[in-house]
Every structure is written in C-alpha cells, then in structure tokens.
Amino acid sequence: MDFRCYGSFSWQIPQQGAIILGNNAQGKTSLLEAVCFLLRLQSPRTARPGPLAAHGKQAFGIRGELPGQARRILWTPDAPDLRVNGEPRKDQRSYLADSYPVVWMGNDDLSLVQAGADARRKYMDFLGSQWHPGYRLALFSYRRALKTRNYLLKHRHRDKLQLDAYTRQLALHGTELKSLRASLLTLLAPHITLAYRSIGEREEQVAVAYRASEEGDLYERLCAAVDRDIRYGQTQNGPHRDDLDITLNGRSAAQFASEGQQRTIAISMKLAQSSLL
C-alpha cells in the first residue's frame, strides 16, 4: 500500500522462485525491495524509510505470508505498527528477532569495488544488522549521537558540556560499532576468498579487510580534533569514515583489477553474505 510506485499490489511467489519481467521503470526492483523491507526493516537502496512512501504520501504498508509467519508493517513518520501473526511487536528488535535473512544482489553491486567508501559501509551495515543482534542497535545509536554532535558543532552558541556529553556517547557507540565490524570482517573474509575461487580464476587471490578510520581511543581522538570539527561543522573521525580494503593479488582491486575481475569480486562479496548467514 502506497509503496514506491504502487498504490496497491498483490503478488504470490511460488516456492520454486520467480522471474519478474517488465519494461524499465515499471517497479520490478520495488517489488523485491518491499519483500526486503518486510523482512529486515531496511532497504538496500536508501538509508531512511521515508523515500519508500509513494509520491505525495507520508506512510506505506506491506503485508506478507511466509512459512509459519504472517508479517505486516504500517510505517508512519510517528511510529511504525509492526505485527507478526497479528500480534504487535513493541519495537524493531523484537520484530526482527524471528525474521528471515536477506542477501540483496543488484546491478549496482560493482560500486562495492569501484565507488567510494559509503557503498562498502552500507554493505557492512546491511549484513552486520542481520549477523549480530547488537549491531543494528550500535549503528543507530551511533548515528543519533553523530547527528546531534554535528548539530552542536555548527552552532556558535553551543554548550561545551553538552558537546562533550555527546562526544562521549559517540565514542561509546562508535567503539562498539568498530569492534563489531572488525569481528564481522574476520568471519566474512574467508567466505569471500572461497567464493571468488569458486567462480573466478583459481590462481588469483582476493582479500577484503576492515579499515577503521582511526586507531586508538576514539574519545581521545574526538577531543583532540574538536577545534577542527568546529571549523568544518561536522565530525571528521569515527566509524562513519570506515572503509574496506579490497585487493586482488596484493594490489588495489579498484585501481588495478579489470572490470570483469571487479564484478567477480562484487559477486563473491554477496555470495559470502549468504554463506555467513
């Protein structure tokens, strides 16, 4: 209901799967996106739910019947109504507790290798939120603290005590998020290597490693850079600057791999998600 380009739509997916055919801009991807959001409360195409509502609408709804489950979402700007088997779930965490994992593969997966760090952080966060129950909480807590701290940095009459309080919150949640990302990549990296060997050239060696934006105590780093942050009006250090180092035979895949090799790496990264989950 009022999701993307659909006012309403009903779709029964056979157990053996389905192939969706249609012209450009008819909403094929939006159908898959709706399934993804129903299961994970996340879209792989946008960071916020707001753009998922149809043009001119503030709310949207999705309902789905799955093996042993009936899920329903009514998403509004105030508070989403989340139900499983007709019973309301008090928060997003309880809604997701018994949901199904999702691996999203799309035409833009090449951006995992070619584009900037934002695409790779989204990859980590989409997977991490399904892999560990504390990941999503750490991520959203960090984002809230970051938004408030940046707001304070931009205002001339800021309260220094309040700024320090949010700096501590940012460091607390950021340190937890960094730890979870590092653990995630330690587990994920071997799956990526194996996936690449199974579909690419066996003699080639692909490696993916987590690169934190800052080493050492995050709170100390933030305090040391506060004058610079005030000058720029935003926080320069923290997990929102993290990245992944992707190499092929020890060299940067973005700079030295062919487009075919880059595409194989991107597919391997998605197949590794499936193996891990």
Q: Predicted segment positions?
A:
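Detector for Asparagine
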Residues: 23-24, 85, 107, 150, ...
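Conserved lysine of the Walker
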Residues: 28
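Nucleotide-state sensing region of NTPase/ATPase domains
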Residues: 36-119, 123-135, 186-194, 219-228
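Conserved NTPase motor "head" modules and their coupling/switch loops across ABC/AAA+ ATPases, GTPases
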Residues: 1-23, 36-37, 49, 65, ...
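Long, charged N-terminal accessory/stalk domains
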Residues: 111, 119-164, 168
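Alpha-helix boundary/capping detector
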Residues: 57-64, 150-154, 248, 272
